[in-house]
Amino acid sequence: MSDMKAIHFGGGNIGRGFVAEFLHKSGYEVVFVDVMDAIINALQQNKSYTVTEVGTSETKSKTIDNYRAINSKTDEDKVVEEIATADIVTCAVGPNILKFIAPVIAKGIENRKKDSPIAVIACENAIGATDTLRKFIEEKLSDSTKSNIQDKARFANSAIDRIVPMQDENAGLNVKIEKFYEWCVESKPFLPSQPPKIEGVHFVEDLTPFIERKLFTVNTGHATAAYYGYNRGKECIHDVLQDKELNEIVRNTLKETAHLIVNKHEISEEDQNQYVEKIIKRISNPVLKDNVERVGRAPLRKLSRNERFIGPAAHLAEMGAKYDALLGGIEMCLRFQNVEGDDESFELAKILKENSSSDATEKITGLERNHTLFPAVEEVVKKVQA
């Protein structure tokens, strides 16, 4: 029985296959928290599951055990109790769900039984996700806890990078995941103490370069391939990148984001080019069998203001630099409509149908109407609406 305990919100593939695997390897007992009955029941009924790394000629499997699972919908008090005595809280629930998990975390922080502050790390594909979570948590805290928050909790942003492809149909809890990973966490929030011990985590003073480089290279590249692939009738990401024309489009998009990353952060052109090549190699991997519809899902989130398309395009527009390839990706994403199993794609179609081009542009992207980028994106919206 471990004396270190981590609470992880989100029993999905990233939670089980990446975050929990690292926590488990570092000696923590992991307590999964979710609202999905099926996931919680499966975790409660099975004492272990397997994480298999794929993506090279060899595959490597690891067994994950020493965990428990709680349904926060039916057992909130139990979750509060666990957080009160835990060392770490992590989550991989999707940026839109942070506001729903915040109240129970706030109660756990209010009831802290440990002298040391709990580490709170959101593992989401979004810039400043832990800051967002902290804001929601603090709205629920008493004034006295809020004024002594440093004694109760330390909040650190993180950047995670690991591709979880489509899973085999009857995989159950077992997760197939790519071999490559990167998990960077801010170190400053833990000062003057040491950051928590999590094997494989890279603690950095300034997370912004890592998070933007990852979001505007991996996520922008992956999404560009997915939306072009979807609109050209391709099945998997590796099929898209085998197409000479589409491969070139993805590369041109990443040239634009590289220009931004090199100019904004202290990253050399050579380093960024090597990073781009590594990313293209990763997402081209046929072993991952990564479906374009899976990668493309949630187009509204992916078209939002600070996300993988509008985020870099807005920066480039402000710099007076080129962003034509990104506009192409934005168009393809806008055409990802009414895709079975993806609510946002239906919502996107509805917005485009029911609004003028300027209203639709503002609603979908969150861009200010007076922003340099707005007219160019509105033209793309008009084209898609036509």
UniProtKB/Swiss-Prot annotation:
It is an enzyme of class 1 (oxidoreductase). Disruption phenotype: Affects the ability to produce liamocins with a mannitol headgroup. It catalyses: D-mannitol 1-phosphate + NAD(+) = beta-D-fructose 6-phosphate + NADH + H(+). Liamocins have high bioactivity against the pathogenic bacteria Streptococcus spp. and can be potential new specific inhibitors of oral streptococcal biofilms without affecting normal oral microflora. Liamocins are also able to inhibit human cancer cell lines such as breast cancer cell lines T47D and SK-BR3 or the cervical cancer cell line HeLa. It holds the Pfam family Mannitol_dh. NAD(+) binds at A6, I7, H8, F9, G10, G11, G12, N13, I14, G15, R16, G17. InterPro entries: 6-PGluconate_DH-like_C_sf, 6PGD_dom2, Mannitol_1_phos_5_DH, Mannitol_DH, Mannitol_DH_C, Mannitol_DH_N, NAD(P)-bd_dom_sf. Signal peptide: none annotated. Keywords: NAD, Oxidoreductase. It comes from the Eukaryota. PANTHER family: ALTRONATE OXIDOREDUCTASE-RELATED, MANNITOL-1-PHOSPHATE 5-DEHYDROGENASE. Monomer. Catalyzes the NAD(H)-dependent interconversion of D-fructose 6-phosphate and D-mannitol 1-phosphate in the mannitol metabolic pathway. Plays a key role in liamocins biosynthesis by providing the mannitol moity that is linked to 3,5-dihydroxydecanoic acid (provided by the HR-PKS PKS1) via ester bond formation catalyzed by the esterase EST1. This is Mannitol-1-phosphate 5-dehydrogenase. The lineage of its organism: Eukaryota, Fungi, Dikarya, Ascomycota, Pezizomycotina.
